[in-house]
Regions:
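Sec-dependent N-terminal signal peptides
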Residues: 7-13
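Cysteine-nucleophile amide-bond enzymes
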Residues: 20-318
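Positively charged n-region of N-terminal signal peptides that target proteins for export
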Residues: 1-4
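C-terminal motif of bacterial Sec signal peptides marking the signal peptidase cleavage site
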Residues: 15-18
Length: 318
């Protein structure tokens, strides 16, 4: 708890607006985010919450913190096969090394690791201390910054008119500190990840329609069939202002032969993580298993988007 307060002092809106760390008492790590649209307008945003729901207890994970050469090689090759430029790949790994060197490899898994649990556990206090002691005042990179760094070349934004970006101030501080995005890229980032005003409803079909309409109005489109932005849309409702949908977490999904690799940054001060999945259903279940944590049903269920549409595999877990 002490470290969470310290992180909040660095950036107050980590929980509400940025890829943020949400840890239970065991140290499980999580995050938050925003996304965009594809080449074709999507009218059918059916978010059927299937009754054939998987128990969260049955999810298992295989992951790496990109500290090992084998996984790094797999990711580099997969990104190159998806059409990402060598320069962008190199910059991504420079960012990974910046974080990993700061926190120390001993605090990260050393290879692609299988665990009999849905989510990894970290010594969160130790990671945060190490990052804060070695980051030279830089807040770090989060899920949105990481996803756009990888996907930006494959996203078009025809109408660069961002909505509410108030809660993205930590993102902006990080971007400004290292000039991560400038000019058109910064305008695209702001437009894609701005919050979307929606009706006050728990109907995920209606919310998905509103998200898609907002993206269509902004003329946001994706153009890569080998690499996709996966986003977890969440609801923000403070009871005073307009209800909004925002991307509480995002990552990039890339093909790797008969597997899928999901590349994510858990939070500004928490690790990069690459997860290996056999199919897209497992991707949805991993994300819903972590981010659908409103047991009292105070807000709508999270909605998982693949690029500009609800994932076909979207379902709510038990």
């Amino acid at each position: 708890m002490k470290k969470q307060l310290l992180v909040t002092a660095i950036g107050l809106a980590i929980v509400l607006g940025a890829c943020s760390n949400k840890a239970n008492n065991a140290g499980t790590v999580g995050e938050s985010t925003t996304v965009a649209t594809e080449n074709t307008t999507v009218d059918n945003t059916d978010t059927t919450e299937t009754s054939i729901a998987l128990s969260k207890a049955k999810i298992h994970l295989k992951y790496s913190n990109l500290a090992d050469n084998e996984t790094r090689g797999r990711v580099k090759k997969a990104l190159a096969n998806a059409g990402l430029s060598e320069d962008k790949i190199n910059k991504f790994f420079e960012a990974v090394d910046e974080y990993n060197n700061a926190v120390g490899s001993k605090n990260l898994v050393q290879e692609m690791t299988s665990i009999e649990a849905a989510f990894p556990t970290f010594d969160q206090d130790k990671l945060i201390d190490a990052w804060l002691n070695n980051n030279q005042g830089f807040v770090g990179r989060n899920c949105r910054i990481t996803s756009y760094s990888l996907m930006g070349d494959f996203i078009k934004v025809g109408n660069k008119t961002p909505g509410d970006t108030t809660m993205l101030f930590n993102d902006f501080a990080a971007i400004d500190a290292k000039k991560i995005f400038e000019g058109e890229d910064k305008e695209k980032f702001d437009t894609i990840f701005s919050y979307i005003d929606v009706n006050n409803t728990h109907d995920t079909n209606e919310l998905a329609d509103e998200i898609v309409k907002s993206w269509n109005d902004k003329q946001i489109s994706f153009d890569n069939d080998k690499m996709h932005m996966i986003s977890v849309f969440m609801t923000m409702d403070d009871g005073k202002n307009a209800v909004q949908e925002f991307i509480g977490h995002t990552g990039v999904l890339v093909n790797d032969k008969d597997k899928y690799l999901f590349i994510e940054k858990l939070a500004f001060e928490l690790p990069y993580q690459v997860d290996e999945f056999d199919n897209l259903q497992d991707v949805n279940d991993y994300l819903m298993g972590y981010y659908d944590n409103d047991a009292e049903g105070l807000t709508a269920k999270p909605i998982i988007f693949e690029d500009n549409h609800v994932m076909k595999e979207y379902r709510v877990l038990k």
